[in-house]
Regions:
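Amphipathic alpha-helical coiled-coil segments
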Residues: 46-62, 85-88, 105-120
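Charged, low-complexity interaction regions
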Residues: 25-38, 59-63, 84-97, 118
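Polar/charged low-complexity regions in secreted precursors and cytosolic/nuclear IDRs
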Residues: 5-8, 17, 24, 31-33, ...
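Short, charged, amphipathic alpha-helical segments
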Residues: 35-45, 69, 94-104
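Short amphipathic alpha-helical heptad-repeat segments
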Residues: 7-24, 43, 67-83
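Low-complexity, intrinsically disordered tandem-repeat tracts enriched in small residues
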Residues: 12, 26, 33, 50-52, ...
Length: 120
């Protein structure tokens, strides 16, 4: 069971919505059927699932266990990429803080996904 505060969940949702917006903005720039477009599609879907779980939306029950499990990989990928990128910046810098917030949000998303998978 997750013990995140409402503030933590709201902040995570804000970050997730921002990431979804950026992903949807670049979506048309990739050619149909390319690996980049496929990865982006999976990332967007995973973020929408995470958003539904964190916010407690009713449609979260519409996701099957397999969909939830598939959503873990893109979330873990975001965490990994942000951790690597954050190493390039000084603690307290704008970029460091931005990556830290994204890591925190994705950690929350991952926890909600894992909890939901374990319930099924």
């Amino acid at each position: 069971m997750n013990t995140y505060t409402e503030t933590e969940k709201e902040q995570a949702l804000g970050v997730i919505e921002s990431v979804v917006g950026r992903c949807e903005k670049v979506w048309p720039k990739f050619a149909e059927g390319t690996s980049q477009q496929s990865l982006l599609k999976n990332r967007i879907k995973a973020l929408y699932i995470a958003k539904a779980l964190i916010s407690g939306e009713e449609k979260r029950d519409g996701y099957g266990k397999e969909e939830l499990q598939q959503a873990l990989a893109p979330i873990e990928s975001i965490i990994s990429k942000c951790e690597k990128a954050r190493l390039k910046f000084e603690d307290g810098s704008t970029h460091y803080v931005r990556f830290s917030k994204m890591i925190e949000a994705m950690d929350i998303a991952k926890a909600f996904l894992e909890d939901e998978i374990n319930k099924r």
